[in-house]
Amino acid sequence: MSTTVQPVALIMGASRGIGRQVAIDLSKNGYAVMLAAKTTSDASKTVPFPPDPNSSQSTVNTVEREIREAGGCAAAVAVDVRDAAQIQNAVDETVRTFGKLDVLVYNSGAIWWSSVENTPLKRFRLMQQINPEGLYATVQACLLYFEKNSWKGRIVVVSPPIYSRFFRGKTAYAMGKVGMSVLVKGLAMDFVRQERSDMSITGIWPASSIESAATEHNKASDPSRKKDLRKPNIFSDAILGMLRAPTSTVNGLLDTDEDFLRENCGVTDFSNYSVVPGATPRRIMPAKFPVLEVAEQDDEGQRMDSTKLRAKM
């Protein structure tokens, strides 16, 4: 196994839409990318090529082919994030292929927006498995390799800033997604406590809806909604900005693509990101988010570690 000179990113959920765009744009910016998702195919037989990026024809294999044909460095691995063994294999395969791991982007997700009454337990469990549990298992699998890299690495999670309006009308979905954001905040605190200053974990969420497989149905039922969509490269541009920023700036940050680009990358004109030229997509996120810190933030009380307590038993 030889170590790739360029930085290496593992992208979970890279088969289409936002994940595909993130993979392509990281490759264009010098990353070797491992594309991981459940959907696979024989890319050599895909016609037309490249396929519609928001269709089921787009898989990790077609994205790999797109990147390779553009001169980039990519590989693909099948993974069902409900299976911890498959997650471990995807992480191990990344290091077997490229010799190291520098960045994890967790874009895998399941969505169901409805009331508690109309969300079956089976659907709820599926979202928990793919969203917070899949993220947790992936992060744990990656931490071993970040440790071998002298605790140098970046994690970017597709999860929202925390605010109460997000819960309305989609409680079951929000429980998982906000749980992912809690992991971002909590692991960031761990990195600080453990003095791992070259590590960071960041959450990112779209300020306006992004054209993806999830928005295709809405466009079909109401074509006028297209004016409220942005291209997925706003998301990949923001992620690239996060990866370039100092860890102290992004560790524990929960932000939107637009706000990060404006406040940290100097972007003032977002018109090029609109799917419909000249349109200004409606912002779906609040203008400001609540501050989660309290006055006694630094008071940890008496520290406890269940691992150490268990070892003494």
How should these model regions be labeled?
Residues N54-S58, A78-A90, L121:
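The beta1-alpha1 cofactor-binding region of Rossmann-like NAD(H)/NADP(H)-dependent oxidoreductases
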Residues G203-I204, A220-A311:
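C-terminal helical subdomain
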Residues S15-R16:
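Conserved glycine-rich cofactor-binding loop
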Residues D102, A110, E117-A137, V156, ...:
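Catalytic Tyr-X3-Lys loop
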Residues D92, R96, I130-W151, A188-R193:
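Amphipathic alpha-helical dimer-interface segment in Rossmann-like NAD(P)H-dependent oxidoreductases
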Residues E147-E195, W205-I210, T215-E216:
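Catalytic loop of short-chain dehydrogenase/reductase
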Residues F49-N61, A110-R125, K148, G169-A172, ...:
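Conserved mid-core segment of classical short-chain dehydrogenase/reductases
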Residues N29-T62:
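Conserved glycine-rich Rossmann-like NAD(P)H-binding loop of the short-chain dehydrogenase/reductase
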